[in-house]
Amino acid sequence: MLYKTGVEYGDYTMNHVLGCSHGCNYPCYAFAMKKRFGQIKSYEDWCKPALVENTLELLDVEIPKLKDSIISVQLCFTTDPFMYGENYTEVGQMSIASIKKLNEAEIKCTVLTKGILPIELAELSDKNEYGITVVSLSSEFKKKMEPGAAPVGDRIASLKALHDMGCKTWVSIEPYPTPNIQFQDLREILDKVSFTDHIVFGRMNYNKLVSEYVDFREFYNEKAKEIKAYCRERNISCYIKNRTITT
């Protein structure tokens, strides 16, 4: 269940669900890899997530073995810990139970979701970090690219509620689209999440429309510069993903 991730800003991760109901069409790298290696047959199968029922039992075995080498555990990299909708309550409950178990072993957890962050998370370790993905405020973009995810306004509201209760929060603005995919003002997104402690920014990959945009490299360079300046002025920490900035 627990494994060391190769993601640049990650340590350990866990993915206690196969598939994701959000069905992102950026495209989704996790879906592409699972399909390539035969773990998922189709997009429809991917959008019908299967919970690993013995997640907590696996953690009981793995935590004692790995505890001393773990800095933090991220939920999740190939699925979502808080999928949107009443049909996925069990997934969210398992996510909270897993975080509790990791916290009991004094392991910090980092969460990222396109769903709604439950307010119960505020009762867990104050070392945890809770995040949401926001790459556009457009409901039409969400409908096309993140069809099963929570409305962006609801995501932000759930993050703000945790922030107001003293939790550490962060926002992933990745994969950020070029204007030929979604014309928008990055500043509007930043202003909506200006309360957060940390922002991660990254370009959109694996979508041919990105490279069709004239000067897409310069576009991402400028947006990264804008993020850095915005965060510096407001004392927000930020991280620009590798290969977002080009020279």
Tell me what each language-model feature is.
Residues 1-21, 25-72:
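N-terminal [4Fe-4S]-dependent radical SAM core
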Residues 55-226, 230:
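Conserved AdoMet/S-adenosylmethionine-binding subsite of the radical SAM
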Residues 2-3, 7-22, 143-145, 151-152, ...:
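Non-transmembrane, interaction-prone segments in cytosolic or luminal domains
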Residues 47-50, 88, 234:
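Generic alpha-helical secondary structure signal
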Residues 113-115, 175, 233-247:
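Acidic carboxylate-rich catalytic motifs and surrounding loops in phosphoryl-/glycosyl-chemistry enzymes
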